[in-house]
């Protein structure tokens, strides 16, 4: 699977002159996104793993620095980011271990922890001043479980509370993301 996805990305990148590629996945897709970053770190600008903690003892760290966001829901019983044992008996790597391992591997010099509220309660951890100026971010939603943030409750298995009336005007949007593009 990883090699096939890599080949598709390379063909697309060459044909359309794409510079920065971001990989994002949810649940098993988050595990796949993280595995892609570990196997081919030079192919991506950044990776985002949404509720896809790696299986206990199988978490990977790329050989080269890459920007990384790992998002988890504290009430997730499918792929738990904190308690590690899922409702079906599988064990997953704690989100904090992944964050700490990546931060250590890429020699990050600063670590900040911010608790904030944006419709839900969050704890955000950011490791900065790392090799190649990458950032490692851990974002724990303390009020949700195994959900894609903001999706309507009636859509698919991975649903959350309806947030269609969410007031996004309080957000500060810019043309640049945290990684400068």
Kindly give the residue locations of the regions a language model identified.
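Soluble non-cytosolic domains of exported or imported proteins
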Residues: 3, 27, 38, 89-93
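Active-site-adjacent alpha-helix of alpha/beta-hydrolase-fold enzymes
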Residues: 74-136, 144-173
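Short, intrinsically disordered, charge-balanced linker/junction segments flanking boundaries
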Residues: 176-181
């Amino acid at each position: 699977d990883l090699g096939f996805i890599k080949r598709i990305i390379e063909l697309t990148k060459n044909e359309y002159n794409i510079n920065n590629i971001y990989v994002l996945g949810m649940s098993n897709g988050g595990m796949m996104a993280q595995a892609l970053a570990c196997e081919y770190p030079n192919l991506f600008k950044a990776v985002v793993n949404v509720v896809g903690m790696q299986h206990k003892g199988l978490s990977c760290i790329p050989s080269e620095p890459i920007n990384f966001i790992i998002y988890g829901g504290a009430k997730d019983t499918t792929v738990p980011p904190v308690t590690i044992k899922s409702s079906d008996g599988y064990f997953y790597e704690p989100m904090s271990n992944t964050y700490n391992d990546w931060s250590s591997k890429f020699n990050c010099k600063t670590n900040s922890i911010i608790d904030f509220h944006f419709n839900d309660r969050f704890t955000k951890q950011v490791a900065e001043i790392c090799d190649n100026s990458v950032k490692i971010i851990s974002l724990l939603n303390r009020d949700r479980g195994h959900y894609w943030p903001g999706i309507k409750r009636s859509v698919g298995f991975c649903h959350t509370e309806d947030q269609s009336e969410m007031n996004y005007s309080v957000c500060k949007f810019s043309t640049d993301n945290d990684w400068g593009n």
